Amino acid sequence: MKKSIRRSGGKSKGARLWYVGGTQY
C-alpha cells in the first residue's frame, strides 16, 4: 500500500484512504 501513497503523491484525497494501511487515517 505504501506504493499507492507515492502514486497519489501523499496529498490527494485518495491518498488519505491509503494512509489507513500506512500510518495516518
Curated annotation (Swiss-Prot):
Major localization class: virion
Keywords assigned by UniProt, alphabetized: Capsid protein, DNA-binding, Host cytoplasm, Viral genome packaging, Viral release from host cell, Virion
Protein localization: Virion; Host cytoplasm
Gene assigned in the entry: J
Function, as annotated: Mediates ssDNA packaging into virion, it locates to the internal surface of the capsid, thereby displacing the internal scaffolding protein B during virion formation. Protein J binds to and is packaged with the viral ssDNA. Additionally, protein J plays a role in viral attachment efficiency to the host cell.
Subunit structure as annotated in this protein's UniProt entry: Interacts with F protein.
Family that this chain belongs to: Belongs to the microviridae J protein family.
Lineage: Viruses, Monodnaviria, Sangervirae, Phixviricota, Malgrandaviricetes
Residue stretches in coiled coil: none
InterPro entries reported for this sequence: Microvir_J-like
Single GO MF descriptor: DNA binding
Single GO cellular component term: viral capsid
Protein name per UniProt: DNA-binding protein J
